[in-house]
């Protein structure tokens, strides 16, 4: 599999690097946290104008007809600069809606998504990656939805939600307007948010149902895998940025009359972090390429997310330690990377959950002893 970037992909990566540097970074993140803002509206508008959402949408639906691999080039930079935007979530929804067999039902919502008039976070991750949906039920006869979904990213900024329901006669994937839903939002350690959605006899008209049956199940599983891969590549970018900040620090910090970066023990820790980042990046992009080609194994998606979650946490913890006591203060920026890693590593399944999913998808069940 050829993982060499094309000229178009190199230009996309360069553009993403510049845009994310302009709209991200520790200073901007602190300002957003101080304002208790769930997302960076200006950064979101800039990414919409750049056309990043359309990379994962086919041309006949108004997109560029590229792939998740191409979007990942932007997501890695968004992770590196700690942008507070729902790029991964809304792109996953756009890709899912464009893949529906009955595209006419999704067409209007998809057009609004691509031009930034509609923010639709994904909630389908609750359906098949750990049972976070509690009693979610769709009454096919009455067309109403009841139940709760927890841990929804950017729920407070949403205009609608893409909801997957497996309980009942058959699976359903529907676009539900946010005005009908009770949304309770709480802050995470990094300043991002998680929302709990409550559906109480929410009417879902037939035209809002994107897919049903086996098609709904297939689309929701693809959506979950998209979300996992997107979060993983953001974590790779985040870890790389934290390591770069740390390398700059240990080159300058003096102890015993010399830079602490000259001490072998810190050199070894830095090299271990670098190797981990490169391995995780390579694995992520290889699986992303396979995902776009429809040749990936679902277990490899979990492997990517598990490794990226573990790697980001280990590298940011090491970064704190190599900064010494100042790294643990609120005033120093390195702590922001660790807090971001804590929140993002848990989103869509952390190391433990993804390792369990990997095992379930690859290991044969053991027979009971006689």
Residue ranges of model-derived segments:
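A short core secondary-structure module
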Residues: 146-181
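A short, Trp-centered hydrophobic/proline-enriched beta-strand micro-motif
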Residues: 115-128
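N-terminal glycine-rich flavin-associated loop
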Residues: 83-103
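Alpha-helical interface subdomain recognition
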Residues: 1-81, 103, 116, 222-370
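Cytochrome P450 C-terminal beta-domain/meander region
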Residues: 131-146, 295, 332
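Short glycine/proline-enriched turns and hinge-like loops at secondary-structure junctions
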Residues: 66-67, 130-133, 154-158
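Flexible, small-/acidic-enriched active-site or ligand-binding loops
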Residues: 133-136, 151-152, 177-212
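A generic structural signal for well-ordered coil/turn residues at beta-strand boundaries
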Residues: 115-117, 132, 157-159, 170, ...
